[in-house]
């Protein structure tokens, strides 16, 4: 059975809480169909976002799509994953609750110098913090 999630990309704004859902703040959105648990997807996001620099939020979202689409490397050749990862128009969100088990919010300022991640299981906030902390919290 698939463990699905949405990955939302949002601007950090003063006074906006990281431990609440903020679908009205979403700039970009990815639908991830499989392996969305924090110990899989969360660790992947934490490791990737900790070590890469981005120009702006569009660059950040594109980088995450690229990372999630590349599944296996053999002899230097990476094989892109077909399916499973989809870009979704965030303006089409009506009620996203009900079919995804996890929601990831990636928060950043316009210069992408500081990134924070929030992880939810339904309406329960499981994690709020920087990428490295997410990675170390859920690594086996």
Where are the language model's segments positioned?
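Short beta-strand scaffold segments in enzyme catalytic cores
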Residues: 4-9
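Short, flexible N-terminal segments of the mature chain
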Residues: 15-63
């Amino acid at each position: 059975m698939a463990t699905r999630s949405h990955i939302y990309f949002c601007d950090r704004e003063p006074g906006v809480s990281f431990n609440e859902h903020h679908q009205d703040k979403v700039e970009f959105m990815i639908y991830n169909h499989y392996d969305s648990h924090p110990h899989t997807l969360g660790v992947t996001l934490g490791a990737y976002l900790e070590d890469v620099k981005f120009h702006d939020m569009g660059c950040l979202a594109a980088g995450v799509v690229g990372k999630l689409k590349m599944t296996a490397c053999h002899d230097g050749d990476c094989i892109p994953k077909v399916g499973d990862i989809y870009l979704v128009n965030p303006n089409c969100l009506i009620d996203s609750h009900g079919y995804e088990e996890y929601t990831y919010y990636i928060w950043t300022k316009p210069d992408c110098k500081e990134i924070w991640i929030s992880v939810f299981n339904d309406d329960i906030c499981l994690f709020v913090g920087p990428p490295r902390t997410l990675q170390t919290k859920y690594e086996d």
